[in-house]
Amino acid sequence: MNLYDRIKPGKRRRGWGGAVFLAAACVVLVICFAPIGWAARSHQRYRRFSTDFAASVESAGKIGAALTRNGETSSLDPDASSRLCRLICAAGAGKVQPSCPQGEPLTVRYHSGAVLDLWEVEIPEETAKNPTGVFVRYTFADGTVYQYDTDQIQMNEVRLALGLH
């Protein structure tokens, strides 16, 4: 008689325990990584906007840009365009919005084909730094639109940067 003859192997249980655990682990992974993917995509879109905007401002320094305000179009000083770019880029990414506000925007048309539209808007969030802010809509030369609002800058700062009083 062998030492191990008295030991009887247990019956193998067939159940859903492993599959349920695997499914729960997959759900947890999706819940954890989906916000990371969303944030990475938002950051990538903002970087594309800021890079293209800076390139448009740089070309405006050589070629020029047009400013439209209250239906009147005038040429935009390269220094003013540069100040506006610094102001908008320093404010950082705002809250992406699906639609534009009503009213006449302050519009800067770059010769690269890009268009920057700015509106003064109310910021309804309680956590907002200021109750009003600026809605930014940037149309790339290929027609793609990136738009957001931010409470980090005010329309009077935009007017000051552009030399409008």
PLM regions: where:
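Function-determining sites in protein domains
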Residues: 2-165
